[in-house]
């Protein structure tokens, strides 16, 4: 068939998204396909007043037929050139091209021509701007001309909203086009044209501003109607364009081997030179903020000998303040063999002046094929019911013959061609973590499985458990393990589960001696498997493996929480005595007292992002329910300096202003990040001297700018899992980072921060390794002041978490959960997981704070971990979070004793006390309870009662 092609001309912008730490310069469609063509002279009549019809021009005297009426030069001069004036400006003859205005004597780039349009625009409407412009004078090459809005209000500073820009050659008419929308109407809105360098004359032939769509609140669209125009290419390539590449329409490709999955045609994005090149459509004005949309695309790839590649749907959003945002909607692993469905959701927190959806991802040279793309308002998914678990049998081992009581391995089989036998001499006591869960329990048999003739690391004992597992029940794993002699390096031993084709980590330990070691882990299944087995693996081939007392049993979480509540009463509450003064004791003896805690001072914070604070509903939940905050990306080096020397602290400043103005304390996350994949390419390319200078500059810039504003800093994130800076600059660099940070901001507590500390899943970051690292830093002079446990945990079990806290608590440093999140498709189970973690943290004396790693759907790092649905509904996990926080408030009722006192026991924080005398007189006072162990006496003045 005949091929139709469309190309896109582009200008450069910057991409600020966490999925690309390099923040390389990206291109976007800022000039339409006809931007460089000479437009015809526009002769439509202007209607000067009203904003009624969508096609009414907002601009008065749009073609200067009434001279300079309604137009004003901005700190420069302007005049109109007409055919009758017998004056031309360069080669532009008004008798041929029509009248135009000349803006001259410009001494600044922002000087140009303006018009007040305040009374002719509406909030939330989308407007399209089209201006015919040229330049004259000392012009060399291309010159930029921009359209801008000036927004003035008495209550705030003047803001400027970029609309569009175009490149102009000398004395050649070019059309400048763009769109804008105002979320609210300021006191004054001024449209103006600006941009050429001082001394260059700006020429304007006509300006139109038409309303493209009605306000969002007035718009009524069917819920199942896609906002993408021509989604199946039935109208060819209309409304589609290439994102800095070519797009082509096909009915087939590859000699007929590739045909559409549906419809008659499909499009390809070809001649791609960057991963982000692809096919796009502008959907400005069609998406409403704070509403969830679902995008569905049918895609595949072709060419360049690439058979599989990641394809991604992305949203580019330009905010009214010209801040660019890239939202990754979804990814899929596409192939050249078949069409694949890509599906994902997105939400806009704030207002947008432009929105473009596009498909990107494969390596350069590989074509993206698109059969269809739809974007619809997402259906609300009904909440999942609480799972019904019959006879959970808490504490009962589901494995057969764990004790090897008949001296055989009946019930077990060897995974691989290894040999299983029974031997004597293993520990007879339960491993500590299992003992904490099971309490009093029969002793182990002392027999173990000896695994010999191992030729692969995965070889070991195994048992099928398919029919023994129950959905949504959390299981704890416990076992003693040991390795044979002859090892010359540390050996990892792992309890693993094969759930259909998925490998599940049931706990790991590193062994470097001939002693028995405990493995403790946990897991849960959320859909019925066709096959499930448990096995023990890990040492190198040729090394014997010994396994004793392996147990898998369901955990009674409610019993654990009851224990923790009693623990919290001991370690978090203190005795308080209210001493009432100010009047004769006889007047208030026996008066009733009602004490209510208003706020617990224990830090409970959350991660936030810059885009989140544009959403009023998000901010409202945040301010009501958290007293600390941490920034997801906006303080990280790859965000603040994506390109060398180009610093961006505006996002962090905006977020810090919100927090400080609402008495929210903040953690600084993070100064450096040791994992190489998170380090900007320009840093990775540096030699040792330049890198060392860059590190010092980063410390100086960040710590001086925010001195005294962040209570904590994660100095060098994830040092147990990465070593980029240490490898490049030597072992002392980590210590020097801590020392320099402390010198620059002595008020901040400096933390280490890492993951898989608390779950038994990673021998790299077990509590023992973390302790060793912290002690090593301190011995070399690093002022480590706090321990960060990230807390990205699956199926948490209290005693396993508590064991890690106990081991780290010996160091005497404050422990914080810095990035806590839990995940389950079932909101009730997610709520259980979160409740477990909150009580374990609150119930341990070494823990001094909890930070959630987000709470709002579509803005979490893990699926199925949110507490609030994207459109603002609090789900079951969120309700449980609020309920736990409510449990952390102390209340007391009683009467004033004969000594004028009222004793009670309560958590630290802010309180209100109401005193009611026998004559029904009332007085309400507030007071605070400090965090201490000893009793606190608080005097309450009742004068006037």
UniProtKB/Swiss-Prot annotation:
E.C. designation(s): 3.2.1.8
Active site: 718, 819
Keyword Glycoprotein: yes
Cellular component per GO, a single term: plant-type cell wall
Disulfide-bonded cysteines: none
Reactions it catalyzes: Endohydrolysis of (1->4)-beta-D-xylosidic linkages in xylans
Domain CBM-cenC: 57-197, 227-362, 397-541
Sites carrying sugar chains: 86, 239, 305, 349, 417, 453, 687
Subcellular location per the Swiss-Prot or TrEMBL entry: Secreted, Cell wall
Top enzyme class: hydrolase
Keyword presence, Nucleus: no
One Gene Ontology biological process: xylan catabolic process
Annotated metabolic or biological route of this protein: Glycan degradation; xylan degradation
PANTHER family in alphabetical order: ENDO-1,4-BETA-XYLANASE 1, GLYCOSYL HYDROLASE
Entry similarity comment: Belongs to the glycosyl hydrolase 10 (cellulase F) family.
Protein name per its UniProtKB record: Endo-1,4-beta-xylanase 1
Organism: Arabidopsis thaliana
Lineage, top ranks: Eukaryota, Viridiplantae, Streptophyta, Embryophyta, Tracheophyta
Gene name tied to this protein: XYN1
């Amino acid at each position: 068939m005949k091929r139709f092609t469309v190309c896109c001309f582009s200008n450069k912008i910057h991409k600020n998204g966490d999925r690309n730490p390099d923040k390389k310069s990206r291109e976007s469609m800022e000039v339409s396909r006809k931007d460089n063509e000479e437009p015809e002279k526009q002769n439509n009549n202007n209607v000067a007043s009203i904003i009624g019809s969508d096609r009414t021009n907002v601009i008065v005297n749009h073609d200067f037929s009434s001279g300079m009426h309604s137009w004003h030069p901005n700190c420069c001069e302007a005049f109109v050139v007409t055919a009758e004036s017998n004056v031309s400006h360069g080669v532009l003859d008004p008798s041929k091209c029509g009248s135009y205005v000349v803006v001259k004597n410009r001494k600044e780039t922002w000087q140009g021509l303006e018009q007040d349009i305040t009374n002719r625009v509406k909030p939330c409407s989308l407007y399209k701007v089209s201006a015919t412009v040229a330049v004259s004078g000392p012009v060399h090459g291309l010159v930029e001309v921009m359209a801008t809005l000036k927004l003035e209000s008495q209550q705030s500073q003047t803001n400027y909203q970029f609309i569009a820009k175009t490149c102009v050659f000398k004395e050649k008419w070019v059309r400048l086009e763009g769109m804008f929308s105002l979320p609210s109407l300021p006191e004054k809105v001024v449209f103006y044209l600006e941009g050429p360098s001082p001394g260059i004359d700006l020429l304007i032939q006509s300006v139109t501003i038409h309303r493209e769509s009605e306000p969002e609140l007035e718009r009524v669209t069917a819920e199942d109607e896609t906002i993408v125009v021509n989604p199946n290419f039935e109208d060819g390539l209309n409304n589609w364009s290439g994102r800095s590449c070519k797009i082509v329409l096909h009915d087939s490709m590859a000699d007929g081997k590739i045909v559409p999955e549906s419809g008659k045609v499909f499009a390809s994005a070809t001649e791609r030179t960057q991963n982000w090149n692809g096919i796009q459509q502008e959907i400005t004005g069609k998406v409403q903020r704070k509403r969830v949309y679902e995008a569905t695309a049918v895609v595949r790839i072709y060419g360049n000998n690439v058979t599989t590649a990641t394809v991604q749907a992305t949203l580019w959003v330009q905010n009214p303040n010209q801040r660019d945002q890239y939202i990754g909607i979804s990814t899929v692993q596409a192939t050249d063999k078949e069409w694949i469905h890509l599906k994902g959701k997105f939400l806009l927190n704030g207002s947008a002046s432009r929105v473009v959806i596009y498909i990107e991802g494969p390596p350069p040279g590989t074509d993206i094929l698109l059969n269809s793309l739809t974007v619809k308002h997402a259906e609300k998914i009904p909440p999942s019911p609480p799972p019904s678990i019959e006879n959970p049998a808490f504490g009962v081992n589901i494995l057969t013959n764990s004790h090897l009581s008949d001296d055989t391995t009946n019930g077990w089989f060897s995974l691989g061609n290894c040999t299983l036998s029974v031997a004597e001499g293993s520990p007879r006591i339960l491993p500590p973590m299992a003992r904490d869960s099971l309490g009093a329990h029969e002793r182990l048999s002392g027999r173990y499985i000896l695994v010999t003739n191992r030729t692969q690391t995965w070889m070991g004992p195994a048992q099928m458990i398919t029919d023994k597992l129950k959905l949504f029940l959390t299981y704890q794993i416990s076992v003693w393990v040991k390795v044979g002699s002859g090892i010359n390096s540390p050996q990892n031993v792992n309890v693993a589960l094969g759930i259909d084709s998925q490998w599940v980590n049931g706990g790991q330990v590193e062994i470097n001696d001939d002693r028995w070691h405990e493995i403790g882990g946990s897991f849960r299944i959320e859909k019925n498997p066709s096959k499930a087995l448990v096995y023990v693996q890990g040492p190198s081939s040729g090394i014997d493996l010994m396994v004793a007392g392996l147990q898998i049993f369901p955990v009674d979480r409610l019993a654990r929480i009851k224990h923790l509540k009693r623990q919290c009463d001991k370690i978090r509450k203190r005795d308080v005595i209210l001493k009432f003064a100010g009047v004769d004791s006889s007047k208030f003896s026996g008066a009733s007292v009602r004490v209510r805690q208003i706020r617990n001072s224990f830090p409970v914070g959350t991660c936030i992002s810059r885009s989140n604070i544009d959403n009023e509903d998000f901010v409202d939940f945040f301010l009501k329910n958290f007293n600390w905050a941490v920034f997801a990306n906006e303080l990280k080096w790859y965000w603040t300096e994506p390109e060398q020397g180009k610093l961006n602290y505006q996002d962090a400043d905006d977020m810090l202003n919100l927090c400080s103005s609402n008495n929210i304390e903040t953690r600084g996350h993070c100064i450096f990040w040791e994992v190489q994949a998170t380090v900007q390419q320009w840093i990775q390319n540096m030699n040792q001297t330049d890198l060392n200078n860059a590190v010092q500059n980063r410390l100086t810039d960040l710590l001086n700018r925010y001195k005294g504003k962040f209570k904590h800093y994660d100095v060098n994130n994830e040092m147990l899992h990465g070593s980029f800076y240490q490898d490049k600059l030597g072992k002392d660099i980590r210590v020097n980072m801590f020392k320099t940070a402390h010198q620059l901001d002595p008020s901040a507590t400096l933390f280490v921060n890492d993951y898989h500390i608390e779950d038994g899943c990673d021998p790299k970051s077990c509590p023992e390794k973390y302790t060793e690292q912290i002690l090593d830093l301190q011995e070399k002079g690093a002022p480590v002041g706090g321990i960060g446990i990230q807390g990205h945990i699956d199926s948490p079990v209290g005693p396993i978490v508590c064991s890690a806290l106990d081991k780290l608590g010996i160091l005497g440093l404050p422990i914080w959960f810095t990035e806590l999140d839990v995940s389950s498709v079932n909101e009730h189970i997610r709520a259980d997981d979160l409740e477990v973690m909150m009580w374990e943290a609150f119930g341990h004396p070494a823990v001094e704070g909890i930070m959630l790693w987000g709470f709002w759907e579509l803005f979490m790092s893990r699926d199925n971990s949110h507490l609030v649905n994207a459109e603002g509904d609090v789900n079951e996990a969120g309700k449980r979070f609020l309920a736990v926080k409510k449990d952390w408030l102390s209340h007391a009722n009683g009467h004033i004793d004969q000594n004028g006192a009222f004793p009670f026991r309560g958590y630290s924080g802010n309180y209100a006390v109401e005193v009611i005398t026998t004559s029904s007189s009332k007085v309400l006072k507030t007071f605070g309870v400090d965090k201490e162990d000893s009793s606190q006496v608080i005097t309450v003045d009742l004068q006037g009662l």
